[in-house]
Amino acid sequence: MAADNAYLMQFVDETSFYNRIVLSHLLPANLWEPLPHFLQTWLRNYLAGTLLYFISGFLWCFYIYYLKINVYLPKDAIPTIKAMRLQMFVAMKAMPWYTLLPTVSESMIERGWTKCFASIGEFGWILYFVYIAIYLVFVEFGIYWMHRELHDIKPLYKYLHATHHIYNKQNTLSPFAGLAFHPVDGILQAVPHVIALFIVPIHFTTHIGLLFMEAIWTANIHDCIHGNIWPVMGAGYHTIHHTTYKHNYGHYTIWMDWMFGSLRDPLLEEDDNKDSFKKAE
């Protein structure tokens, strides 16, 4: 038992270290040090998530909409400031709830309820990468079906997912739309990351990093720029999802859509649009 407690303390020490790093640079000590460990962790996740959302979003928008204007997107496809402000407002209302999920997952890990491990040396590098691959496949499968059911189950779409799908044209989508969800919707789509903890051994620090990478990834797939990197589910695929509502539910890759018959290729979409335009002429 003492050995188990000593092992679990590695997780507590690591989260406490992250709390100090973030909170000590953003808040006076008297505001956060008296808080219980759980609330410190939530506050750290909330502040870090908010900073990541705005910094990545602003840098992304500045680059593609201003430095590279008319390079990646035509000027008339750039979303309005008003649309981006609305996306920020929706995301900020949900952010306190979004960041509760990683806080709860860290708490479960600290209590030893999951298969998380503290050091890569416990399994070695080969198994580390094998477990990451299994973890990501599980997450991909889980997010695909969670996302698809949020469309197929009408009450879930009406009361949850429709909040995100008001951005249904290229000139209304921006990197800031990536987290503009109803909070319950956003949490449901991230739940596979937490369920995976009980099934697949995963390195603790890697799990935290993958959760926060979601903010970067969701910004990327809402910028409407088709990178055309197989088998990545990039923004070209996701833009089709926002316009057809019934294709490209996948997350990182196109594999789940390919397996379950919901894939629509943006290059084929362009060809179809060109053919339709020629017929109209």
Swiss-Prot record:
Annotated phenotype, changing residue 114 to S: Increased maximal velocity and KM value of the enzyme
Cofactors demanded by this protein: Fe cation
InterPro entries: Fatty_acid_hydroxylase (IPR006694), Sterol_Desaturase_Related (IPR050307)
Assigned keywords, A-Z: Endoplasmic reticulum, Iron, Lipid biosynthesis, Lipid metabolism, Membrane, Oxidoreductase, Steroid biosynthesis, Steroid metabolism, Sterol biosynthesis, Sterol metabolism, Transmembrane, Transmembrane helix
GO CC aspect terms: endoplasmic reticulum membrane
Subcellular localization: Endoplasmic reticulum membrane
Keyword Repeat tagged: no
Record-stated family: Belongs to the sterol desaturase family.
Protein name as annotated: Delta(7)-sterol-C5(6)-desaturase 1
Organism: Arabidopsis thaliana (Mouse-ear cress)
